[in-house]
Amino acid sequence: MQGTVCENCVEGRGSVDRVDLARLMSGLALFDHAARALPSDQHDDRDLADLVADVSRIGIFVSTQGNVFMEDLADDLASDLRSTGVRVDVLDETADIETRPPICLFIAPHEFFTLGRGTDWVRDDVLSEGFMFGTEQVQTTWFNLSLPFILMSRGMLDICTQSASLFERLDMAALHVLPGARHRPRPLTERDRRHPLYGVLPPAACGDMDPSLPFASRPIDVSFFGTSSPRRDAFFARNAAFFADYETFNYNRRPGRGPIRSEGEDGALTRLAGHVSGHSKITLNIHREEFGYFEWHRMVRLGMCSGSLVVSDPCLPHPDFVANEHYLQENARYIPDLLEWLLKTEDGAREANRVRANVDSLITNSFDTKRTVARMLRFFAQHRSRERR
């Protein structure tokens, strides 16, 4: 089995038919209002203390050679779990395999098991006893890399509700989890403030960010952080003259530069992205390609949690964050018109404040960390390996 997994990953076997995927995803668009009409999950956190005692210890593993955003995800999950008393060790591929915790959650398996010493962890016992946290969109080569590891695991968690649903249809244990949805300040280090990108900020955006800063008081009109793609490049080139009239911050990283790492100048980028969003009226989300996944890191962690209004081209529906209630959604062709209305008219400013207030209420009142952790622990307790209890 180990050889099969390695061959599939190294040789890139298998692919997703994009036409079939588009047909499937278009059907999932009907999910939006239907899901909201369903009764809410009846499980609560009354059994949390028993679950914490039962599960006891969890290891969250993330590659040291992967994207720094995966470290953000691991830290958010660990913070949520620790807040309820769970013992959590955030580990990497250099940890001792034989003394790993009884419950192991591997973040971004396409990175962890294929980079550096992570290949040493491609063992039947590790994979069959572990849980995987999927982070990649179904149509991508990174998803293909992660698929063998996910299928060999005891269960998978995913930040995308549609991806988790697809695995559930295969009778696999799967759970959608949205970690760390809360307002947060993003302090910069002195080294961050020496980064070239910090040097181009307007003076009013150089101070500490405040998620509660009013829409009209934010010095940056529109910001975008992401990786360059033909679709994104075409959008920004087509609308360059429009954006030139506004205070904008646009960081499009070229794919050839590789993942954003935690060390060196790259280490400042994720903090700077949050800092910029915290000073932006609008955080823009333009999908890399035609499949409009709800992009948690940019839309929620960077944008909404920084108090910025998120504007996106159409997304797959999300069970909690609803288009035109918690973010504004528009066809990419008409996004400049929407931005102009928001930034230049009183009606637009009122709409921006309405949506920001909805997000504030949702994050403050609906994302109970205890319930989120209880769902995760219940999932681990139900599907873990009995041999490693």
Regions found by a protein language model. Name each.
Residues 20, 27-101, 108-125, 129-323, ...:
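Nucleotide-sugar donor-binding catalytic core of glycosyltransferases
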Residues 316, 321-324, 329-335, 362-364, ...:
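Conserved catalytic or regulatory cores that recognize and/or transform ribose-phosphate-containing ligands
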Residues 346-385:
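A charged, aromatic-enriched C-terminal amphipathic alpha-helix characteristic of glycosyltransferases
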Residues 331-350:
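C-terminal "capping" alpha-helix adjacent to the active site of nucleotide-linked donor transferases
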Residues 1-31:
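Intrinsically disordered, low-structural-confidence terminal and linker regions
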Residues 152, 299, 338, 358-362:
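Short, hydrophobic/aromatic alpha-helical segments in well-folded domains
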Residues 276, 338-341, 379:
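CheY-like receiver
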